[in-house]
Amino acid sequence: MKNNYVVLFCAFFISFLGNAQNFKSSKKIVDKTTKLPLENVAIYNDKDNSTTNQEGFFVFISEKNEINFNLLGYNSLKTTFEALEKQDTIFMEAKAFELKEVVITNVEPFIKKVYNKMEENYSSNYTSNFFLRNVLKKDNSIVVLQDIHAKRAKNTNPKNPDEIQVLNMRKTSFFEKKDQIDFRFPDLNEFFRGLFPALDKNIFTEEDYNDLDFRKILFESKEKNVEGQIFKGYFVINRNDYAVVEFFTTMRDNPEVVPYKKITFSSVQYRTTKYERLMKFSKNSTLNKYYLQLSKLMANVEVVPGTKSGSSFYFNLAMDYFTTSSFTNEKVEPNFATDKDVFKAKFPYSAEFWNNQNQLPLTTELKDFLKRVSENKDKKKEFEIIGNF
């Protein structure tokens, strides 16, 4: 009976049942040469969007019989759902790396033009649906899994730049009761906040890139911050319209010197040893404007318990976001504050809803986590399990 429960538990979460009026494809994408899985591949047509998980798997559902695959540094593919039916794996070929003659140039004028054209290049008012997955680990074990499907209305109001309507949610957490430390997820204000470097406080250099249509610009802050860290990262910029299509930053270059902080009214200490952001932007062909297509936040927090017997451990957070549809004019009815801890959201779960949504497939590690939750669901003395399905 327990085994049946595990199978059903995972099946409801994966939601692989299709909708007769939609086309659907669930495949794996790998590098043609190395055969390694490709993460963050953009899968789309002019109506719907999806992406690949860490293992290269994706689910794409659309009313339109067209699929495009795009990843910077690789040749794009265009096909149909029918053409993919007999393929289990999709192979993407990396573009040939053409090493340019080394020329020392001043990239600051180019970067200034990129910044000056941001208002022109990016849409500041639009509505789109999105998928957000939050995974929290304690050391190497998953303790929280949350998937959210919602509408986001982005606008120019500086006091309230984003309005969120959660359409459905599924979550579960699995903690040992001896763990008394509560981890707070970032709110959506922090998640959507831009972190572009100030022009006058950073050094910009160019690095060779294997696509002649783009330039890769590295940046690094001139001075360390109060925690002794250098802010660094890179841009990938379209040469034709000066739009940033990919942005990565890390705020921890020397985590060992980051000072500890204390939790109020406690002897527990903690410090953030990793904080990285990845953002990818796509162009809407109708509006001729770019929008946030994919975003990732990766953070590690070291915790030192106050008790002598307790050993230090790490919380590792991964937040994965991608838009699931093109722009719409649908009105958003906000039902979740953007300054609230994301995991504190309370909404019902509907298996039927998730059957027809573009979403990240579960990785093997996540499936194992759900199996562990189901196998220990009755051990209420040892474990605290919170979930909505």
Model-derived regions, located:
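Bacterial Sec-dependent N-terminal signal peptides
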Residues: 1-28, 389
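Short, ordered, surface-exposed loop/turn motifs in non-cytosolic proteins
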Residues: 23-25, 33-46
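A short, amphipathic beta-strand motif
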Residues: 25-32, 56, 90
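Short, acidic Ser/Thr/Gly-rich low-complexity loop/linker segments typical of extracellular
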Residues: 48-57
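Short Pro-Gly-centered beta-turn/loop motif in secreted/extracellular proteins
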Residues: 59-66
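A short, solvent-exposed loop/turn motif at the edges and junctions
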Residues: 68-79
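Surface-exposed, low-complexity/disordered segments
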Residues: 91-215, 260, 268-389
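Extended beta-strand-rich segments in extracellular/periplasmic secretory proteins, especially
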Residues: 193-250
